[in-house]
C-alpha cells in the first residue's frame, strides 16, 4: 500500500480558504496534503471513521456512549460517499488530505484517496473536531502554541477508558494545548458551550494523572513547547476511535490521518450551544 508522507515536519498553512468548496477542491485535486488546522477557520472540521455496515450499529452506540471524544456530526448511508448534511459536494473518498487504513487493528498504510478501496457496504461517520473551537479561542485572544509554531496539535493516549459498545473499547485520546492559568479558565468557559466539538477539557495539569508518561512524546501530532508558567490543557479527541480500532481489531477500518480533517460547510457559529 502506498504511504502518504504525513510526518511531523509540517508547516503552518500558507493559505486559508474563505470558501469551503474551494478548500475541498484543493484537497480533492491533491494540491493540499497537509494538516488542516486554520485552513478554513470559520468552518466546522470533522474526524472520519469508515466501517463496514455490519459494525455500524455498534459504532453508533459507541459514539452515543462516549460523546466527549466521539460527538457525531453526521452518518452516511451504506455505500454512499456523499454527506449532504455537511456539504452539498462532499465526496468522502477524496475530500480528506490523508486517510489511514487499519486491518485487524493494525495500521497498514496511508493513502491520499479511497477510490480504489471504497466498497458498497462502507458507512462513514464524521465526528466533531477541536480545530473548530480553536477559532473561538483565537478570537478571544488565547494563543495556541501549535498554531504559532506551525505544527499539528499534540495528541496522547490516556488511561481514561471509554464506555464499550459491542467490540469497540479502549482508551480515550486527548489533544493538548499549553496555556497560562487565566487563559485556561477562559478556554474552559468557551469550549464548554460547544459539546459537538468535544466541549470543555477533560483534564488540566499533571499529565501523569491521566497516564501520559512523557508529554514531550505525543502519540499523534507534534510536540510543542510548554513554558514554565503554563499548564497543559487536555481535551477529548476524535482520534480516540483510532485507539479503539487498535484494541477492537475489526477486519477493516478507514480513518482520517490525525490532524488531516474533513472541512464541512457548517459554520462554527452555527453549532448548537450548551
Curated annotation (Swiss-Prot):
GO molecular function: lyase activity
Record carries keyword Lyase: yes
Keyword field: Lyase
Pfam family, one: D-Glu_cyclase
Domain of life: Bacteria
Entry EC number(s): 4.2.1.-
InterPro entries: D-Glu_cyclase (IPR009906), Putative_hydro-lyase (IPR038021), UPF0317 (IPR016938)
Key word Lyase present: yes
NCBIfam families given in the database record: PRK05463.1
Family: Belongs to the D-glutamate cyclase family.
Name by which UniProt lists this protein: Putative hydro-lyase Veis_4744
Source organism: Verminephrobacter eiseniae (strain EF01-2)
Lineage: Bacteria, Pseudomonadati, Pseudomonadota, Betaproteobacteria, Burkholderiales
Amino acid at each position: 500500500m502506498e504511504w502518504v508522507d504525513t510526518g511531523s515536519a509540517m508547516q503552518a498553512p500558507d493559505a486559508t480558504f474563505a470558501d469551503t468548496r474551494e478548500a475541498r477542491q484543493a484537497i480533492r485535486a491533491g494540491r493540499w496534503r497537509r494538516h488542516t488546522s486554520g485552513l478554513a477557520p470559520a468552518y466546522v472540521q470533522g474526524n472520519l471513521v469508515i466501517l463496514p455496515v455490519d459494525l455500524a450499529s455498534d459504532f453508533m452506540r459507541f459514539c452515543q456512549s462516549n460523546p466527549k471524544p466521539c460527538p457525531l456530526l453526521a452518518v452516511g448511508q451504506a455505500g454512499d460517499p456523499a454527506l449532504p448534511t455537511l456539504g452539498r459536494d462532499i465526496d468522502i473518498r477524496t475530500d480528506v488530505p490523508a486517510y489511514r487504513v487499519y486491518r485487524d487493528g493494525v495500521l497498514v498504510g496511508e493513502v491520499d484517496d479511497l477510490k480504489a478501496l471504497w466498497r458498497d457496504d462502507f458507512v462513514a461517520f464524521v465526528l466533531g473536531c477541536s480545530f473548530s473551537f480553536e477559532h473561538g479561542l483565537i478570537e478571544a485572544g488565547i494563543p495556541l502554541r501549535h498554531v504559532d509554531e506551525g505544527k499539528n496539535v499534540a495528541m496522547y493516549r490516556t488511561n481514561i477508558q471509554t464506555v464499550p459498545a459491542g467490540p469497540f473499547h479502549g482508551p480515550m485520546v486527548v489533544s493538548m494545548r499549553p496555556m497560562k492559568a487565566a487563559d485556561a479558565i477562559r478556554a474552559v468557559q468557551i469550549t464548554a458551550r460547544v459539546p459537538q466539538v468535544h466541549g470543555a477539557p477533560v483534564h488540566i495539569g499533571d499529565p501523569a494523572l491521566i497516564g501520559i508518561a512523557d508529554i514531550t512524546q505525543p502519540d499523534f501530532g507534534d510536540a510543542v513547547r510548554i513554558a514554565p508558567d503554563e499548564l497543559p490543557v487536555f481535551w477529548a479527541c476524535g482520534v480516540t476511535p483510532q485507539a479503539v480500532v487498535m484494541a477492537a481489531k475489526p477486519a477493516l477500518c478507514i480513518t482520517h490521518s490525525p490532524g488531516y480533517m474533513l472541512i464541512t460547510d457548517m459554520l462554527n457559529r452555527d453549532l448548537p450551544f450548551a
